[in-house]
Amino acid sequence: MCEEEEVYCPELQDTTQGKSLGKTCMKCKESSAVLLIRAGDAFCKSCFKEYFVHKFRATLGKNRVIYPGEKVLLAFSGGPSSSAMVQQVQEGMSRDAPKKLRFVPGILFIDEGTTCGMSHEERQQNMSEVQNVLQQTGFPFYIVSLEQVFSLPGSILQRGVPEQRANYKQEVDRFMVQQQAQGETGCSDILENLAKLGVNVSESSRESDKMFQSTCRHPPDTHTQKLIQLFASAKTLTAKHQLLHTLRSHLILHIARTCGYSKVMSGESCTRLSVSLLSNISLGRGAFLPLDTGFCDSRYGDVDIIRPMREYSLKEIAFYNRLFHVSSVFIPALNTKVLENSSIQQLSEVFINRLQADFPSTVSTVYRTSEKLNVSKIDANQGTCAKERCLLCLSPLDTQVGEASAFHATQISHYISQKILMKFNDPANSSGKSCCQEGKCCKGPGYGDFCQPRALQAPSFVDMLCYGCRLTVKDLQSLDALPQYVLHEAEHRSRRIEMRKEIEEFLLDKDEENLH
């Protein structure tokens, strides 16, 4: 029997007290630790800086994708990760760096305030703060508005031709020989770097950069209204996130190509990539995980996206920025002050963060899983043909699968449901008459609302998209809100496909070409 005054368990005691206090640095074994990254990983301030810098250099060194003298564009968002990335590049080019970075950096900031409903004054204040931070780096920088996507050319959706480079070691040796021949002692100053590599830094060039930035910072009001209408047409916050990511990628690619940058550094951390992995799988982008979360994204051909901060967790970045006074700018985004179930991206982030709080190895486990994913040889060796690439994200199309697939079954189900819906909603079908008779199109005088030009073009437009982008476009109320360069490129590809169908019987297959 249970007694009223019986004690069933001893008094709880704090067993963790004193375990993390008074620890010495795990590296130098001398100084007192000032931070604890993980259980048992205590660092002093100087050793933590050495550890942080070494990890950045090692990530770049073991991949060897940035050649000496190459122009690299740093994508700066104002957040902690991109701020730490810019700081690492800045320190890598200082006079005190033992092994200086040998590329030429530039910085790009994209103002996305319109998507969050920010006023013109708030956007100008944010851009002023960003400009003050970027001016302290001494690197050339560009500040553009997201509205500039409405003035992009259609060629931005075409995959560029990769530049054929020599062996990495040969490029380094040739660069060192050029340095010795020119009698240079270092690359500490960015202006010396630009002059050494033949980049024009004259006053006329600086004035042209100022005019370029002025044009991009103050877009026309019509572009602002179009951007507002585009995001208003998205039914869900998930679609808005995907649409923003797509437009931002297009604008970064355009600036990189226009200004001659062959590499773009992005500041995604290990934590951010773990969230992206889960959300992308949920959004039907699992086929492109090696491109979306890997170190190097080469889908654009002539411009590669690299992620040198992917080895760092957000905790490490926060410690580094706090200890060494790295400036950052807080700018509200689409996911600022929203509910945890408002979008798939937000739900994935909350899920990862809560698991990480209870199980500290969650992020590293998910991240290490993504490292094992590689692009298949078929996708990697695909040509630059327009129909083989997604119209929006430029990834290899993952919809060219057999009939015995889940994608094909989903398409049949969608087609049948849409056909039944059109049968009941189409006034022409309900009256037993065709909407177009005797060769006359119903788009003439008096045609009904059920016959919209865009509705006829929608199927061919969707066929040019990957599965993930199809889900995003499905949440748009109208395709007319998309930028003109997207619609023009879709029309151009449609004409090429129709032309190829007309002459297909006269073309030789690859097997026939080999026989001849």
Curated annotation (Swiss-Prot):
Residues spanning the signal sequence: none
Pfam annotation, one family: CTU2
GO annotation (BP), single: tRNA thio-modification
Principal subcellular localisation of the protein: cytoplasm
Record Gene3D superfamilies: HUPs (3.40.50.620)
Pathway listed: tRNA modification; 5-methoxycarbonylmethyl-2-thiouridine-tRNA biosynthesis
Swiss-Prot/TrEMBL keywords: Cytoplasm, tRNA processing
Keyword presence, Secreted: no
Keyword DNA-binding: no
Subcellular location field: Cytoplasm
Superkingdom assignment: Eukaryota
Annotated transmembrane regions: none
Single GO term (MF): tRNA binding
Any one of the GO CC terms: cytosol
Record InterPro entries: CTU2, Rossmann-like_a/b/a_fold
Function: Plays a central role in 2-thiolation of mcm(5)S(2)U at tRNA wobble positions of tRNA(Lys), tRNA(Glu) and tRNA(Gln). May act by forming a heterodimer with ctu1/atpbd3 that ligates sulfur from thiocarboxylated urm1 onto the uridine of tRNAs at wobble position.
Assigned protein family: Belongs to the CTU2/NCS2 family.
PANTHER family registered for this protein in UniProt: CYTOPLASMIC TRNA 2-THIOLATION PROTEIN 2 (PTHR20882:SF14)
Protein name as annotated: Cytoplasmic tRNA 2-thiolation protein 2
Organism in which the protein naturally occurs: Xenopus tropicalis
